[in-house]
A protein has these predicted regions:
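A short acidic/glycine-rich loop-to-helix N-cap element
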Residues: 170-186
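Short, well-ordered loop/turn and helix-capping segments at boundaries between secondary-structure elements
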Residues: 68, 72, 92, 169-173, ...
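Short, surface-exposed loop or secondary-structure junction motifs
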Residues: 1-140
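C-terminal accessory segments of extracellular proteins
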Residues: 181-197
Length: 198
């Protein structure tokens, strides 16, 4: 239907029409994926990208682990070299911009272009100035998550080791129709601006 910023919540996956993301096209046979599904057999079909189900507290623990070079609550869990490998760039967009797609899984040429310009081992390496953030850290490391009406991120400043974990549900049907100054939604930008300024 028509986007209405003040409108009611619109079901995306738990309504009568299931609309899971299986590529950059709308499927008319979305319910077909459920035909052979047995409860409890494999939740992958219903899991977020990457399969991580975590609370904001869990995400904050992961950030503390990475920011503290593999230690959490006084216990060494990962070697420092392992954390360095995770956070180091495995890929970066070249100056010509022709060695990858920066929109992630979104349609190229849209508001999400520039989302990924440097990537570690499943870690976004974000140039905050390129995203239009004039204040705060120049770089953030972490991950942005989306699944079934959930918007989330877990990001930290590698210099100060300060971080933020955010999980928001119940957003309106299409928050991408009013893009901000970055590849994020305005909701995500607003939370980051709040964090930077507090």
């Amino acid at each position: 239907g028509q986007w209405n910023v003040d409108g009611l919540w619109q079901p995306q996956v738990d309504g009568e029409k299931i609309s899971c993301f299986y590529g950059m096209f709308e499927r008319s046979d979305g319910a077909k994926f459920l035909e052979n599904y047995e409860l409890g057999s494999n939740a992958t079909l219903f899991s977020p990208q990457g399969g991580l189900r975590a609370s904001a507290s869990d995400l904050a623990s992961i950030l503390r682990l990475l920011a503290n070079e593999g230690a959490l609550n006084g216990r060494k869990i990962l070697k420092r070299s392992s954390v360095e490998t995770l956070l180091s760039p495995a890929w970066s967009l070249n100056a010509a911009g022709n060695n990858g797609r920066t929109s992630g899984e979104a349609q190229p040429g849209g508001a999400r272009d520039g989302l990924m310009t440097s990537y570690g081992l499943s870690v976004h390496r974000i140039d905050m100035r390129a995203w239009g953030f004039v204040d705060g850290p120049a770089t953030l490391l972490g991950h942005v998550g989306r699944a079934y009406g959930v918007f989330s991120f877990a990001l930290f400043d590698p210099d100060s080791r300060d971080g933020i974990a955010m999980i928001v549900t119940g957003v309106a049907d299409d928050p991408f129709k009013a893009p901000g100054h970055s590849p994020l939604t305005r909701l995500e930008e607003t939370v980051l601006h709040w964090w930077i300024n507090h």
